[in-house]
């Protein structure tokens, strides 16, 4: 977005939330592996770079992308507090962090949001929800559609349909022929339930998630405008607590394949 960010944001800067991340680099020697780096000097270097690239005076929500085992949470939280006082960020959060890390960091500078993988096929993070509710921390779900699988758009697709190297879905376990076969019953259930609510599968998946808690949101991604519009419609579909519970009970029983980042069996 270099050289065009100001034109994009300026007319409606007060109407959008700008969120970005810090805390990782990519190895030049091991196929681009993620290297956590949350040293205070690196954090400051990262925030200055983001402010410059985004051409904004402050970042609304600044996430630690991955936990750095070499830097204590209190150290990271202290730097976040300094950046808030300096007006460079408004809020901060952590991504893929254990409960102990969250609690320790939160004591130093309150965390506004935790981000992690969450979908109908990746529900392990639900065990952290009571802690987030206790501390008053919001939750941001990434991959809420299991990298597109729960949209139903790839019902007949397998890894071979995605361009190797360029499209990471070509390497994801949920798109193997065996996985697609295993998920047929789940997909049929979601399709039927979506139709009962005059919704698409994507909208049902997102409505189920958003109906769980008022402090939970999701960040589905898409390269197509029609998909973005469709996903936004998930906020309009309303499910009762009883309906959400019934879906949960069905999900507990239905067979599910592994997905990227999660072992289901």
Predicted segments, located by residue:
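N-terminal binding-site loop/beta-alpha segment at the start of enzyme catalytic domains
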Residues: 1-20, 159, 256, 264
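Aromatic/hydrophobic pocket-lining residues that form the small-molecule binding cavity
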Residues: 5, 40-43, 47, 73-76, ...
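Acidic (Asp/Glu)-rich catalytic clusters
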Residues: 6-17, 51-55, 84, 105-109
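A short acidic, helix-capping loop that chelates divalent metal ions and anchors anionic groups
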Residues: 25-32, 150, 227
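Active-site mouth loops of central-metabolism enzymes
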Residues: 29-44, 65
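Short, acidic/polar
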Residues: 38-53, 98-103
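Active-site groove signature of glycoside hydrolases
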Residues: 51-70
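Beta/alpha (TIM)-barrel catalytic core signal, keyed to glycine-rich beta->alpha loops juxtaposed to Asp/Glu
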Residues: 67-254, 259
């Amino acid at each position: 977005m270099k050289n065009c960010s100001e034109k994009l944001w300026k007319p409606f800067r007060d109407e959008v939330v700008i969120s970005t991340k810090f805390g990782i680099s990519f190895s030049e020697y091991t196929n681009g592996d993620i290297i956590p780096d949350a040293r205070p000097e690196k954090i400051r270097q990262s925030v200055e770079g983001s402010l410059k690239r985004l051409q904004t005076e402050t970042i609304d929500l600044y996430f630690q992308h991955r936990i750095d085992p070499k830097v204590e949470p209190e150290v990271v939280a202290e730097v976040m507090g300094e950046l808030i006082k300096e007006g460079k960020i408004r809020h901060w959060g952590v991504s893929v962090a254990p409960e102990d890390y969250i609690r320790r960091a939160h004591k130093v500078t309150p965390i506004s949001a935790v981000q992690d993988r969450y979908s109908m096929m990746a529900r392990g993070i639900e065990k952290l929800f009571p802690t987030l509710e206790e501390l008053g921390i919001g939750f941001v779900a990434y991959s809420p559609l299991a990298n597109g699988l729960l949209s139903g758009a790839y019902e007949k697709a397998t890894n071979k349909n995605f361009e190797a190297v360029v499209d990471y879905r070509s390497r994801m376990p949920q798109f193997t022929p065996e996985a697609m076969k295993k998920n047929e019953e789940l997909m049929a259930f979601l399709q039927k339930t979506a139709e009962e609510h005059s919704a698409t599968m994507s909208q049902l998946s997102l409505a189920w998630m958003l109906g769980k808690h008022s402090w939970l949101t999701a960040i589905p991604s898409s390269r197509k405008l029609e998909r973005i519009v469709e996903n936004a419609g998930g906020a309009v579909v309303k499910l009762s607590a009883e309906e959400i519970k019934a879906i949960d009970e069905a999900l507990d029983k239905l067979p599910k394949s592994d997905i990227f980042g999660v072992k289901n069996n």
